Amino acid sequence: MGEPQRPLAVSLGDPAGIGPEIIVHAWRMRDSANLAPFAVAGGANVLRSATEALGVPCPIQEIDDIAEANSAFLEALPVIKGLDGAYLPGAPDPIGAKLALKSLEMATRLATAGHASGVVTAPIAKGLLEQVGFTHPGQTEFLAAACGLPEDASVMMLAGPSLRAVPLTVHCPLAEVPGLLSIGLIVERGRIVASALQRDFGIERPRLAVTGLNPHAGEDGKFGNEEQDVIAPAIAELLADGITATGPHPADALFSPHSRAGFDAALCMYHDQALIPVKALDFDQGVNVTLGLPIVRTSPDHGTAFDIAGRGTAHPGAMVFALLMAGECAARRADA
């Protein structure tokens, strides 16, 4: 019999947001959702307070070592000692942001050191993190840097039960997208996506569908030349590499049930082109997966939701799916 899988490390997220409560709910769903064991990087007091506010049973067990999580997980939510703070739902401040950052750093260290099988990150508020010294555009770029990679070496994929989609450009003004797209960018990220679908998702021959940038995928240059000058040559290069890739597809027709059956992931030209269909189809189960890292990382595809924090109305589905996906990806890597 092989060794048990190492636990996942879960960051607390901003303690004023919905992170603590969706973590509590996820632990309570551990059996029905068949979740792998996980431990939270600090915040025992925050999680106890969240449990009390929710009025649900969730015993908290503080542990010294994440290895203890496997045995503790069945009976209690394991929380690693060393970090804590106050639970003030809906009242974000720099103190809470600093706790969120320290928790993210701890969870990441556990994964990069090989003690955790992967990282699942709860939502943060980037503006507040910047006030306490966070210098990265987001958690994705932070994790790449923590793994010793350039910030642009990782790829963000949004995934749910119905669709996987990758925005090739992310947090930038829409007006800048045409200038940011290049054959090299599309090819490099297409290779990362294809490799990750094989390694982490068990898809032997991944099929990539590549969108156009312009309406009707440019309609032979009538509405723009990016499809002819950039996107089609990139697809040809991916095909030459042995990667199954089709397109450029008009984005408005790509996400129907019939079309989705023909590909494993969509490469989209900009943020909303990828995120709108994922959130429309799988809003309560959408997961942000970071591809191209030596560690597994997932996150629920939603924000801190300060406006509903502490009310008991936050849906835990995306956190549950993020934990489930991280556990499955980690298991595939362990078996490889």
Swiss-Prot record:
Gene3D superfamilies xref list: Isopropylmalate Dehydrogenase (3.40.718.10)
A GO molecular function assigned to this protein is:
NAD binding
Which Gene Ontology cellular component annotation is one that this UniProt entry carries?
Answer: cytoplasm
The cofactors named for this UniProt entry are: Zn(2+); Mg(2+); Co(2+)
Location comes to: Cytoplasm
Q: What is its main location?
A: cytoplasm
Could you tell me the keywords of this UniProt record? Cobalt, Cytoplasm, Magnesium, Metal-binding, NAD, NADP, Oxidoreductase, Pyridoxine biosynthesis, Zinc
Residues binding substrate: T140, K279, N288, R297
Named in its record, the pathway it takes part in is: Cofactor biosynthesis; pyridoxine 5'-phosphate biosynthesis; pyridoxine 5'-phosphate from D-erythrose 4-phosphate: step 4/5
According to its UniProt record, the EC number is 1.1.1.262
Matching entries from InterPro entries are given as: PdxA, PdxA_fam
Enzymatic reactions:
4-(phosphooxy)-L-threonine + NAD(+) = 3-amino-2-oxopropyl phosphate + CO2 + NADH
- Give the cofactor note: Binds 1 divalent metal cation per subunit. Can use ions such as Zn(2+), Mg(2+) or Co(2+).
Q: Which GO terms describe its biological process?
A: pyridoxal phosphate biosynthetic process; pyridoxine biosynthetic process
Binding of a divalent metal cation occurs at H171, H216, H271
Task: Mention any additional remark.
Answer: The active site is located at the dimer interface.
NCBIfam families from the xrefs? pdxA, PRK05312.1
* Function according to Swiss-Prot or TrEMBL: Catalyzes the NAD(P)-dependent oxidation of 4-(phosphooxy)-L-threonine (HTP) into 2-amino-3-oxo-4-(phosphooxy)butyric acid which spontaneously decarboxylates to form 3-amino-2-oxopropyl phosphate (AHAP).
Protein family? Belongs to the PdxA family.
Self-association and partners: Homodimer.
User: What protein does this entry describe?
Assistant: 4-hydroxythreonine-4-phosphate dehydrogenase
Naturally occurring in which organism (per UniProt) = Erythrobacter litoralis (strain HTCC2594)
Q: Which gene encodes it?
A: pdxA
